[in-house]
Amino acid sequence: MSENKTRVDNAATGDIKHQGKDIFFAAVETTRMPMIVTDPNRPDNPIIFANRAFLEMTGYASEEIIGSNCRFLQGPDTDRTAVQSIRDAIDQRVDISTEILNYRKDGSSFWNALFISPVYNDAGELIYFFASQLDISRRRDAEEALRQAQKMEALGQLTGGIAHDFNNLLQVMGGYIDLIGSAAEKPVIDVQRVQRSVHHAKSAVERASTLTKQLLAFARKQKLQGRVLNLNGLVSTTEPLIERTFGPEVIIETDLDPALKNCRIDPTQAEVALLNIFINARDALIGRLNPKIFIETRNLVVDELANMSYDGLLPGRYVSIAVTDNGIGMPASIRDRVMDPFFTTKEEGKGSGLGLSMVYGFAKQSGGAARIYTEEGVGTTLRLYFPVDEAVLSKNDPPKASERRIGSSERILIVEDRPDVAELAKMVLDDYGYVSEIVLNAREALKRFEAGATYDLLFTDLIMPGGMNGVMLAREVRRRFPKVKVLLTTGYAESSIERTDIGGSEFEVVSKPCMPQDLARKVRQVLDGPNGIA
């Protein structure tokens, strides 16, 4: 035993030229797996041995790397977090297994499955670090190709679903608008027929708007109006909704943690998310004996070791709400797809397939997660997690919105690159008593201000061509003409607008599409605000 210890100790000094009979180094040399040995007792933990497989994998000669630290394998795209985890493991003298992007001598990159382990002698002294490696580039490339294929499949499903739903809505809108146009040409107008057509066209617009918001929520682009609330209170306020959704034949049980912490989420989107969960649970209970729903809330602490068990939630404190049904459940083949957009097992017309994807997007954008547990024939649990908010829940009633007032001939400059959209906004604002003008780009708007035209409000689209978008225009107008109030509008995503240090929007925003009364109300709020922020 002492003879073996001497051989190992000698090798640890770096004098390995005469260690050919050493079983350890002979095994390392002859294996087909790339391996190196480093000496932690020397400065910078240099390589003291590299086998032939390692040299072939990296393209280096032995004399080029012996005595060097392994960092020469790193390159511009090497993950610095992975590098730091390796350094930490070496400092702590523990095993580590990771995958990292490394570089060969010729500059080409490869994915390296790396395993590092400390080696001790009989006296318990650290003498080596032993590192085995494997080029797994083909596997990683195959995984990336699979992910890309899955993305394309999902994109195809998404675009197909969008086209299907929007074509139906456009058919409704276009058809009823044509009917209104035909009615206007007749000598005697059937008022009831026109009113019915207007009602159906407006309903289609509202459904299209809801569909867009659900898509943006899935993509985590929809702006959420977060405020501090308690999930127990949310359950209480939605009790009538729950009862209407399930009916008297379904038993509803709750277990609400009385010490539940608060969270900051959008209450409207939260209610919509719960409604989608309830609807799916209701459909799963059809035909089941003793149908039952169980709603539970609880506090949760996620640490660094457990975060992957919660879909990568950041370590911290969370609250959760779970809805469990004893319905039909789902097979494993469906479980992993139920939160994909437009994926549905329901019949045509019974669901768009956006409900649970909207739930997923809402939870993610709120800093949380959505998880589903299901067993075919047994039931399903859908649980949402949200970060705890330490702010004190306000006991005051929410402030009421400003009362609607007709405009008093305030002058409004409309900046919109779509003439039809701009003309509609002008008609609406003029009908409400404002005096509005239209320009089609930001440069023209600035020219109006520079020429001495006076306006009380700048109403500008967010996304415009020409090198200056709505935010840039708004900032320039506010800088040069500080008395002018600003209101932005967008049909894309309010998350494109930068946030202030206090967490609010830099400018007030109204989303497209919006009803005329909503636009007029928002304009009134901004005009009444002290600095353009209601």
Swiss-Prot record:
Modification sites for 4-aspartylphosphate: D461
Tell whether tRNA processing is among the UniProt keywords: no
SMART domains in the cross-refs: HATPase_c, HisKA, PAC, PAS, REC
Check the record and name the PANTHER family matching this protein: SENSOR HISTIDINE KINASE, TWO-COMPONENT SENSOR PPRA
- What's the protein name? Blue-light-activated protein
List, alphabetically, the CDD domains matched: HATPase_CckA-like (cd16919), HisKA (cd00082), PAS (cd00130), REC_hyHK_blue-like (cd18161)
Which EC numbers does the record give? 2.7.13.3
**Organism, per UniProt?**
Pseudomonas syringae pv. syringae (strain B728a)
Q: Name one GO molecular function term.
A: ATP binding
